[in-house]
């Protein structure tokens, strides 16, 4: 495939996209619900509405949906960026400014929104980067996760990069494309550029920048943790996929349905994908949430994220580098869950895996004001923030950005 950021690369026509997707779905053993590509997004939204997902404000995990992973190749200059606007986020506290800006670089351009808390601090603030799932927006994701309220409580900034329909018709982050899985290219480079720009403007503590996401956003968060280990101190992945779990549309569809579940290492990955693939190499603190009734992105993907993280830690710390314990409990909303903690020798959590029993493809403990939320589960947002802010990070004099 040609470099998608080359000025000579034309955009795919809808007919070509349609034919490509049809072949990909057939290869993955799936069947498309839409007859024409231009109607696919509307069809997906209509199908999701009864389950209270996009297009509905009901909060229910009862049904899952198909995530459209179709990608459109775009020239950075072709990206349409709307004018900068401001909106007011109305949370439990007094209204505060929730600003929209845009970022452009040689690798591409994206809009983003960011939240700066009113709470003042004598020290540089931390920052959490939130990557939405398919069909979502920054406003939708902020409402569903309530991350802005947590930012106000703890005094950190929040950045919400937005995928564009020009880059992906369903606004999915292109986690499944090889050029979007590497450093200094594609979407990882654009998101890293946004993060550095906001951090420089607002005096963010460069040791305390974290990234989290849902579904396609979680898969991209995992990629960012691997490709920019010096920029992101930790990762939060909710209903996501492991690093380099796919390299094109057919392998993406297979991975989502559990095609790589239980496979470990580069050799196994190559057998599953039919091609060589990358292996996570950086030991990075990570917290993973996944519902065990998720039929959109199978739970085995969350387990594989944990396995990749464990392998990276073992490579750097030795086989006995982490101590494992498991807890069983129930959330105030009623859902039971299992929490597995992998801690270092000092008892500090480095890898956490939360399995939410009976939950589907939705943000656990989320607000019904946003899509893809399940208010009955443990509060994923609060637990991710707790995990991030409790990390023992290196002092400024040994940190290199």
Regions flagged by a language model, labelled:
Residues 200-201, 206-281, 295:
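Primarily recognizes the serine-hydrolase "nucleophile elbow" in alpha/beta-hydrolase
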Residues 1-127, 139-140, 145, 212-216, ...:
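A domain-start/cap signature at the N-terminus of enzymes
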Residues 162-186:
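Cap/lid segment of the alpha/beta-hydrolase catalytic domain
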Residues 129-135, 239, 290, 357:
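The conserved beta1-alpha1 loop
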Residues 179-202, 223:
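Alpha/beta-hydrolase active-site loop
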């Amino acid at each position: 495939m040609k470099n998608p950021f080359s000025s000579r690369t034309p955009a795919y026509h809808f007919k070509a996209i349609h034919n490509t997707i049809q072949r990909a779905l057939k290869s993955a053993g799936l069947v498309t619900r839409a007859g024409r590509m231009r109607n696919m997004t509307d069809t997906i939204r209509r199908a999701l509405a009864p389950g209270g997902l996009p297009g509905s404000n009901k909060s229910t995990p009862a049904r899952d949906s198909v995530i459209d992973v179709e990608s459109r190749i775009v020239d950075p200059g072709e990206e349409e960026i709307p004018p900068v606007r401001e909106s007011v986020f109305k949370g439990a506290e007094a209204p505060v400014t929730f600003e929209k800006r845009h970022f452009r670089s040689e690798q591409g351009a994206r809009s983003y929104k960011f939240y700066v808390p009113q709470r003042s601090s004598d020290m540089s603030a931390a920052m959490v980067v939130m990557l939405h799932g398919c069909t979502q927006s920054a406003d939708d994701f902020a409402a569903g996760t309530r991350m802005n309220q947590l930012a106000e409580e703890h005094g950190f900034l929040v950045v919400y990069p937005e995928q564009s329909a020009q880059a992906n018709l369903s606004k999915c982050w292109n986690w499944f494309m090889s050029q979007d899985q590497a450093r200094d290219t594609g979407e990882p480079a654009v998101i890293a550029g946004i993060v550095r720009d906001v951090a420089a403007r607002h005096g963010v503590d460069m040791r305390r920048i974290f990234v989290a996401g849902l579904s396609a956003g979680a898969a991209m968060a995992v990629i960012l943790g691997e490709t920019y280990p010096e920029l992101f101190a930790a990762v939060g992945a909710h209903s996501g996929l492991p690093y380099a779990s796919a390299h094109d549309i057919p392998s993406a569809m297979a991975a989502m349905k559990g095609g790589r579940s239980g496979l470990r290492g580069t050799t196994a990955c190559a057998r599953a994908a039919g091609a060589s693939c990358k292996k996570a190499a950086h030991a990075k603190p990570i917290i993973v949430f996944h519902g065990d009734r998720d039929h959109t992105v199978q739970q085995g993907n969350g387990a594989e994220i944990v396995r990749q993280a464990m392998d990276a830690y073992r490579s750097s710390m030795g086989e006995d580098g982490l101590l494992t314990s498991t807890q069983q409990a129930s959330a105030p909303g009623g859902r039971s869950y299992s929490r597995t903690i992998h801690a270092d020798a000092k008892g500090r959590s480095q890898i956490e895996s939360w399995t939410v029993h009976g939950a589907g493809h939705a943000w656990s403990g989320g607000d019904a004001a946003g899509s893809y939320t399940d208010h009955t589960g443990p509060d994923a947002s609060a637990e991710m923030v707790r995990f991030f802010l409790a990390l023992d990070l290196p002092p400024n004099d040994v940190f290199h950005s």
